[in-house]
UniProtKB/Swiss-Prot annotation:
Transmembrane regions listed in the UniProt entry: none
Domain of life: Bacteria
Gene (name only): rplJ
Database matches in CDD domains: Ribosomal_L10
Origin species: Chelativorans sp. (strain BNC1)
Protein keywords: Ribonucleoprotein, Ribosomal protein, RNA-binding, rRNA-binding
A GO term for molecular function: large ribosomal subunit rRNA binding
GO cellular component: ribonucleoprotein complex; ribosome
Name of the protein this chain belongs to: Large ribosomal subunit protein uL10
Pfam families recorded: Ribosomal_L10
Subunit description: Part of the ribosomal stalk of the 50S ribosomal subunit. The N-terminus interacts with L11 and the large rRNA to form the base of the stalk. The C-terminus forms an elongated spine to which L12 dimers bind in a sequential fashion forming a multimeric L10(L12)X complex.
Job description of the protein: Forms part of the ribosomal stalk, playing a central role in the interaction of the ribosome with GTP-bound translation factors.
Alphabetical list of Gene3D superfamilies matching this protein: 3.30.70.1730, 6.10.250.290
Family per record: Belongs to the universal ribosomal protein uL10 family.
GO biological process: translation
Species classification: Bacteria, Pseudomonadati, Pseudomonadota, Alphaproteobacteria, Hyphomicrobiales
């Protein structure tokens, strides 16, 4: 990689560290190309991305970003998984690591908070933004449904009383 290319790569990586919801750092020694492509496609489907960068360039890109505290994680063959959704990258990386011993999560960051491997796994267990939005919409709709039932209940009760009188008159 030439010097100009390195500058561009560091600048793009710096933007990643500044603008993403979460970053996961993991070692990938022993992953086959097919496994790496599988990880990349799963991450892409979840709205994230995976990059492999030289540790020295990643450390330079981290300078001046909220995620600066994770520089110590960049040792050996490391990859960076990131997404705008704070839960997506940790979730996909953790699920992939469960099925593949060659991917070892070292840690990560969510904003200015540095996370160890257990912190990343804990973050992965949280519901995603879409799941949280669905729960909130459900909680908002539930009271409206109950109000509609309460408003319609007196009319239904009145109809049952009238129906009972009608059956009583028919029986007599």
């Amino acid at each position: 990689m030439e010097r100009a290319e390195k500058r561009e790569f560091v600048a793009s990586l710096n933007q990643v560290f500044q603008n993403t919801g979460s970053v996961v750092v993991a070692t990938y020694a022993g992953l086959t190309v097919a496994q790496m492509n599988d990880l990349r496609s799963k991450m892409r489907a979840a709205g994230g991305s995976v990059k492999v960068a030289k540790n020295r360039l990643a450390k330079i890109a981290l300078q001046g970003t909220p995620s600066e505290g994770i520089q110590a994680l960049f040792q050996g063959q490391t990859l960076i998984a990131y997404s705008d959704d704070p839960v997506a990258a940790p979730k996909i990386a953790s699920e992939f690591a469960k099925g593949n011993d060659n991917l070892v999560i070292l840690g990560g960051a969510m904003g200015a908070t540095a996370l160890d491997a257990e912190g990343v796994k804990a973050l992965a267990s949280l519901p995603s933004l879409d799941e949280l939005r669905a729960k909130i919409v459900g909680m908002i709709q539930t009271p409206a449904t109950r109000i509609a039932q309460i408003v319609n209940a007196p009319a239904g009760q009145l109809a049952r009383v009238v129906g009972a009188y009608a059956r009583k008159d028919e029986a007599a």
